[in-house]
């Protein structure tokens, strides 16, 4: 641990209720800082019940870090697991009381109105909202995520919010998060000062703590490596360049992103990523045209066949990476 990582916990513990937005820049260890505060609260008997809400892509990483660093066991909840819990319990029993320490996706909670009543009648000692910028209020409208966060803000004494990007350039977004932490903090979301949010927010950049880390942050050195496409990659690229998709041609005036554009992105990611995109589109087309009377299916299968010929040896960027 580095000394600056203890500061959020120290700041929060100086208050009667631990409610804080940790907004350090990427790489300073916001998850670690949250874990330090959570561990101290557990040691003080104020952390028996914990709820962590994050985006789905971060659930595993957060769960592992809490266990490996702090021995805090978080049970992963999703819709199917909640339904499984509910099946074991009497009808009037709240499923959120079944486990004491859980982690759940923000979208799992926001998408099911049935959970709202259970959340309104549940209570936790600690609630953590990771990637908190996703729940900030935007303008005059409150998203489902923002409404969910506002509800959760009232279901715990301790509220820890984490984000590296606390605002979108507008003061209202930060103000909405501050008012979740303390409804009395900001009277006018368009007109407030740093003093209004003192003690609620901590934000540091690498330059702010450089003297504490003694060279821990090395300067990033970027070099450009060039690699020529293999013959099989060139063959697949040629098929793609000449490819015309009927569905795209008929939708060129639409506002959506054309499939060929998204396919191009996956193609330059990796052959496997492109094949996955092709398979998904073929499944949709075959469902819509069960007789197979759709030229796009044949065209996509031709590109897929060319991509399947690209072995790891033929995948030029991968081969180059192995040599670095």
Where are each of the predicted segments found?
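Pre-Walker A segment
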Residues: 1-15, 19-20, 301-319
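SF2 helicase/translocase NTPase motor core
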Residues: 1-10, 17, 30-33, 39-154, ...
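Short helix-terminating capping/connector loops at secondary-structure junctions
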Residues: 21, 45-47, 253
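Residues at the beta-strand->loop junction immediately N-terminal to the Walker
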Residues: 23, 53, 163
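Walker A/P-loop nucleotide-binding motif
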Residues: 26-27
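Conserved Helicase C-terminal RecA-like lobe
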Residues: 38, 42, 217-228, 273-324
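Inter-lobe coupling linker of SF2 helicases/translocases
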Residues: 91-92, 97-98, 103-124, 136-167, ...
